[in-house]
A protein has these predicted regions:
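Extracytoplasmic loops and strand-loop junctions of Gram-negative outer membrane beta-barrel proteins
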Residues: 1-4, 13, 54-62, 96-99, ...
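Outer membrane beta-barrel strand-and-loop segments of large Gram-negative receptors
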Residues: 2-8, 14, 23, 27-86
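Conserved C-terminal beta-signal and adjacent last beta-strands/turns
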Residues: 13, 73, 77-93, 103-206
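Small/polar-residue-rich segments within soluble enzyme cores
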Residues: 18
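Generic beta-strand structural signal
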Residues: 21-22, 118
Length: 206
């Protein structure tokens, strides 16, 4: 990226709306917002220049658009299945357009995250899944390309115990259980995210 100190500051108009529901076991909230941004700053591809970074596909310079519009929406839910078992989910979506109705870069496709959380005395465990749909509304004008969909599974378990007056929390887990090769819409040059990995955490509270 090449900077540009002569750009005007962005200014925006924003509208928000949400609806929510909650009882003893279930809570849900659907929210959305809309932005109309004047002098929107974005990186524009410059032709004829060779990138210095190995693997780079072009050089961009920051410039401003007359205006851009961005719409975001998200749904959050929580269900208390049992006293020891909770289910959380989140769905998010974003869409952006410039003043020429071209797609804006770095707008998240439909993404989701869901987790089952178990708590019983000093034992805890979680099974989670997250992912993105295919990135079809990419901003080709601004140098973006399509990104495939993916779904990633994780699991962990923890236990808390006392030792010589200290509280010790241990947690062991596996991320990306099925060793899926994936990249997100925001990753530079489509460099893959980490594959299957194992971790062990040990927290000591004196």
């Amino acid at each position: 990226y090449i900077g540009n100190p002569n750009l005007n500051n962005e200014s925006s108009l924003e509208a928000n709306a949400f609806v929510a529901f909650k009882n003893e076991r279930i809570s849900a909230k659907l929210s959305s917002n809309y932005f109309h941004i004047s002098d929107y700053i974005v990186g524009k591809v410059i032709g004829g220049l060779v990138p210095m970074t190995i693997g780079g596909k072009g050089v961009k310079q920051y410039g401003s658009l007359d205006y851009a519009t961005i719409f975001n929406a998200d749904l959050n839910t929580q269900v208390q299945l049992f006293s020891f078992l909770k289910w959380n989910s989140q769905f998010t979506y974003a869409r952006g357009k410039d003043y020429r109705k071209e797609n804006l870069p770095f707008m998240s496709p439909l993404s989701y995250r869901s987790a089952l959380q178990f708590y019983k005395n000093k034992l805890s465990a979680e099974f989670s899944v997250f992912g993105n749909s295919r990135y079809r509304d990419f901003a080709a004008v601004y140098g973006e390309t399509e990104t495939t969909d993916y779904t990633i599974f994780n699991v962990n378990a923890g236990y808390q115990f006392s030792f010589n007056g200290m509280k010790v929390l241990t947690k062991i887990g596996v991320e990306n259980i099925f060793d899926r090769i994936y990249t997100t819409y925001a990753d530079w040059n489509k460099i893959p995210r980490p594959g299957r990995n194992f971790y062990l955490n040990l927290n000591l509270n004196f």
